[in-house]
């Protein structure tokens, strides 16, 4: 496994928080949150509904560190095309139990698909690792995220000063 600088910083943030060193956890998380590329643009950004509409369900823009799985489309089809892995048969089950039925969470609105079986039974399955035909050649869509920018925000909110937590939230 090869980890770049920001993956190491993200892992440090997670570890420092685990061991109770909130100052170092906050500093490491901030290093990832404020990271810029060579042009001065943010290196990572939080996902948007637009990412989901483009079929990028794992939100590669948020990923600091991930694992590549070349056969992700085949594995997704194997696991989610039947009635083995699903989260309920009603839309309210997914929305209430997982997201609190806010109506504004982009995951609540875009990450679940109603799958109708040959016997007319229907199930809600997660699209997160679905690789669509349009994106199947893109390497970024064949990854399983391990460290994300969103986690760095949560660590910074938990470990940083209260005034900073309000700004980051």
Residue ranges and their predicted role:
Residues 1-150, 162-164:
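Structured, solvent-exposed acidic/aromatic patches
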Residues 168-169:
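Short, surface-exposed beta-strand/strand-loop-strand elements in extracellular ectodomains
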């Amino acid at each position: 496994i090869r980890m770049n600088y920001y993956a190491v910083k993200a892992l440090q943030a997670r570890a420092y928080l685990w061991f109770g060193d909130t100052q170092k956890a906050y500093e490491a998380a901030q290093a990832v949150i404020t990271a810029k590329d060579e042009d001065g643009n943010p290196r990572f950004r939080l996902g948007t509904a637009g990412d989901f509409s483009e079929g990028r369900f794992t939100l590669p823009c948020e990923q600091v560190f991930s694992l590549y799985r070349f056969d992700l489309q085949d594995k997704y089809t194997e696991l989610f095309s039947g009635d083995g892995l699903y989260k309920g048969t009603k839309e309210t089950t997914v929305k209430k139990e997982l997201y609190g039925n806010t109506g504004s969470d982009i995951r609540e609105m875009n990450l679940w698909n109603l799958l109708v079986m040959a016997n007319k039974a229907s199930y809600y399955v997660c699209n997160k690792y679905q690789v669509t035909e349009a994106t199947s050649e893109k390497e970024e869509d064949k990854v399983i995220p391990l460290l994300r920018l969103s986690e760095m925000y949560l660590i910074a909110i938990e470990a940083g000063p209260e005034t900073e937590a309000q700004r980051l939230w």
